[in-house]
Amino acid sequence: MGNAKPPVRFQRANYVVTDLERSLLFYRDVLGFEVEHQHDSPADSYSYPVFAIDPSAQLRFALLTAQDQRRVMALTEIRGTPLPPAALPRRAAIVLDVADIDGVVAGARRLGLQVHPEERLETHDGRTGREVGIVDADGNLVVIYTITGVASAEPTA
């Protein structure tokens, strides 16, 4: 049967944030995601129990789309209850291949975000590039990279 559903398909990552508009300055304006949908979450939202959110808090949700990946990222804003700082060591990250790594780094710095020193990237298949870790205003880690060199071909016998 040609229409069999695959056993798994990645739908989206979600980060919890304290100020959706501030977060969009980074995710939309610097990284280039588009806001596809935004809404206040209902009081019986599944997000409350699965994220262990105080039921008295108000939630707002934004779905973000990349150029060729619809609804691949979400931001959930929690208002009305204080959030503890993000735990260290960091337990999650999103990893993004970006076309303009220097522009993203400059934009993150303009927003006052923590930007880790750039490192040389070496992939498992021998490609090389650049990578930089950026921590958003809520302590969520975003690792950006760009490939600058291709793997060298193995000599043929």
Which residues does each PLM region occupy?
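Vicinal oxygen chelate
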Residues: 1-6, 10-19, 38, 59-109, 130-135, ...
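Core segments of cupin and vicinal oxygen chelate
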Residues: 16-69
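A cross-kingdom feature marking solvent-exposed beta-strand/loop segments within repeated
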Residues: 44-48, 80, 123-124
